Amino acid sequence: MHKWWARQLGSVFRAICLYTLLGDPTRVSIRDYPESGDDASLSEFTDGNEDDELDIGALIDSVDLETPGGLWELYPQDVQVADTTVLDPFMGGGTSLLEAGRFGASVTGVDLNPVAWFVTKKEFEAAEIDPDDLEDAFKQVESDVSDELTDLYQTDCPHDGSHVADVVYALWVRSLNCVSCHETIPLFKDYRVAKGRYEDSDRDHVLCPDCGGIFLTDDISTESVCSDCGYEFIPANGPVSQGGMYGCPSCGLKYPIVDAIAEGQSYEEELYAIEYYCTDCEDEGAERSTYKGYTSPSEGDVKRYEDAAKQWAENDDLSKYTPDGEIPDGSITAASSISGNDIFQHGYETWRDMFNDRQLYCLSTLLRSIDKIDDPDVSEFLLLAFSDSLLFQNNFARYNSAGSKIEGALGRNSYTPRTSYAENNVWGTRAGRGTFTTTWQKLLDAVDFAHNPTERYLENEELHETESFEELISGEYTLLQGDMRDVSLEDEYDAVITDPPYYDNVVYSEVSDFFYVWQRLLLSDSYDFFEPETTPRSDSIVSNPATGKDGTTFEDELGIAFGRIRELLADDGILVFTYRNGDADAWGGLVDALCSEQFELTAMYPIAANASELFGDNKPNVTVIVVARPVTSPQGEPISWSALRRKAHRSAKRAREQIEESDQSPSEGEISLMELGRCLREYSQHHGQVHRRGETMDTVEVVAEFQNLVSGEITPDEIYLSLLEMETPSRRDLQRLCYSTNVSPNDLQRRGLVTDDDTFSIATWADESRQEYLASTADEDLTPLDQIHLLRQKSGNAGELRDQRDMDTTDELVELAAELARLTNDDGYRGLFHE
């Protein structure tokens, strides 16, 4: 319903709830459970009576690492767990609470951030609101302002002057003067407007820097000729280069953008292109390339903008519907160890500087209309949609020329100043994303789901959806804003399910201020914690140089938080949380924080990264489910490192055997993480009491030893063979296989085992990149796979093959050749060691 950062998938928390809350069979019931004949995989767990009633106790008892799938069969069922309480002390966007509530649990959520509280509040209220009331309120706002707002985003239809088209996106470029010759320089990185569509999908729309015309070209990296004025240029080469420099085409001077601003210049802005959508042409049956495309701005387009800017300047009543405070100095608003962007160096001072005048006029007009809705519950839903649309209504939003769409601000959890940006249609039209009407529709879809919740699941590799569940997305819930270390809470929760702060977590206070400063305009009179100018900073548990909090402070505060959780959790309760996989320092700090507050870490399970995380440097973000339980008796006796290592090795080995005997297929790295969890379970029973050579080992040292113990020596060869086993291996498969190993995807690419340019593919011995690697590698550095591929290359020449084979033949190579023949159906491998 609204942007929140690092959200875990709902399916992740549903799975966590399924395996966490179903502990006491007497509390569990399944609504509308199908007869066993309809679900053969569960028939063995029936009581055997004529009603085929499910024996939930037997089902729960059947689950272990070898047979984890029994409970999984209940994933798409309407499972209810009676008399169960769940706490999330770091609720964020509320996903954990919503999923626990679907199981019938009574849930309590806490978050320091008012935006998180407001978003989660409306998510729970979605099942309580009458959709007709929402529709009536929207129609009131639509009647009030939609015509005025849409009129300001219209342009003359390029194909028929008798009517107008809608502006989907208005594209702006900023400019500075050359500090030497004073020529005005538009700050383009290149002159590509957008990738071509439809019949022109192999071409690009480009802007002529001479006349401002827009035309199609075959290749932006080569000389292009403007179809309007004949100007010749290379569209890929704009004045702005890497490092934030801009070059003058007249005198050739290159100068830092931020230095020019520091010396007194300010950005000027110019409208350079419009993406339009003509509903009249579409309704008349025109081709898609006619009713949707790009055009140069006309005098009328400039006038529409100027009219809006004038109304904004002259309408004092609207000023109270836009934030006017100064942007706080912070770790992501100014340059710091967290972010290299410094918006102040680009001339930003107040929140209003993040929007152009037409945006300010339209957004304030829309918010004023929302404020007129009498019912505060309904008005808050409209405010939520308005707030979410702000991501795409600002001058940090960029136009994705390859995807022909707008990309919202804060995509990398920071404020990134743009030299060109996309202005969205505030109200919206038939095309485009992030408009008020599209975010409103997204909210209505969420409300509908809250009233009619379903679940999607895979069966026979096809996605299915259940019928609507009886339990709504609501139930008993309590949501509190405040510091979880201080707020008043009942104790004896059955489970704490959460996603706690990480060491290098998103600085939520700073990114959420972007929404908060708008939300508080309507909420400050109703909620005290929306009165301050910005969200709380000093109490956030995060490493933040702007508030003087380093890693040590973070670990101390996280430990206090776990201590508070221990106070609130029943002695037989369970703590389950998601955590980002990290190095020994990260895991060591976490284990110290847990064990120091009387928790025992009992298991770890890797999962895919959360919904918003991006992959960088070929390394995926691995999230781990961590399971811990309260310790009610004193921890174990002191132990030597050698004895602990033996215990941990046995436990890890047993875990691996159970996994390998199951029908699951985790990657080697994923298995290693589960083994690490078993090792840390053994250590948590002797926390702070492990001795080696007369000294007590610190936790980071122990974790590092365990990581070496479980990682083994996974080789690129093994990962390559695993990829060959797959029917259609992908880049994502490669990343998964490399999870928590000492191998990176780059290692395979460097060896020529995979290619990952425009498309991902598995290389063979015959690929040029593979042959180049083998030719450049010394004999003593060749792996068994390298040697087999060399033999396969020489198999066409009997003499060379005989010489190579006499030198290298081993049983390992013979077996590997047979395996490659099986995996690749290349019979050439079969004859490598036979005359």
PLM regions and their residue ranges:
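Conserved beta-strand/loop positions that form the S-adenosyl-L-methionine
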Residues: 89, 110, 498-500
